[in-house]
Every structure is written in structure tokens, then in C-alpha cells.
Amino acid sequence: MKLSNKEFDKIVQRAIRRIPDEIRQHLDNILITVQQWPDPDLLEEMGYPPDEPLLGVYWGVPLNERSATEPPLYPDTIYIFKGPLEEMCASLAELEEEIEITVVHEIAHFIGISEERLVELGYE
């Protein structure tokens, strides 16, 4: 599936609106940006397997690791990777659901929720 950037951005916005308020409220201070593909250097730095698609990543300092005296140097950002999501999804509904799951996972990294807890909440 290939979408224009404008169409993809609309689906990202719809997916974000589907996220429960208690999780979505944490987006107030997080920038969300869409990139076509993850940078290969980023994948290598993360130790991410090259044969697994990376759908999104949180870049910043998680709340539970912040210092009261030293604020983060850069804004917290969630990157959504359009190319891998388009390749993975067969329908617009599936794409919207995967974007929602991806954004929730990245918010979880920001607020310190573990992968195990996300599974318990239904976000696998």
C-alpha cells in the first residue's frame, strides 16, 4: 500500500484520536513526526535486527529518568516510519490500527511503561 504524505498524515491523526485519553494526554509535550524510513545508523545504534521492520521510535529522556535540575536538551519526539508501515499493512483500517499501537508503545517508553504492561493493556 502506498499513500501520499497528506493521506498518511490524516491516518496518523485519526489513529492518535483513537488512543485512550489517559494515554493520549502525554502527547501534549511530545512532537510526532513522520519519516519515510528509519536511518540505518539509528538501527545499528539501537541494535535493531535489520530483518525486522521498525515502525516507530521514541527519542528523548523518559519521565522516570529526568533530572529536576537538568532539563532535556532536545524536545521529546516520536518518529513514525511510513515505509515499513505501508509495506506491513494491507488495508487502511490495519494501517490506522498499527499506527495507534506504535504511538501507544512510544508514549509508553516516554512515561516508563514496560512492554509487559503494554501487553497486559492489550497493545501487543
Task: Name every feature range the model reports, one short phrase each.
Residues 120-124:
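Short hydrophobic/aromatic patches at helix-to-coil boundaries
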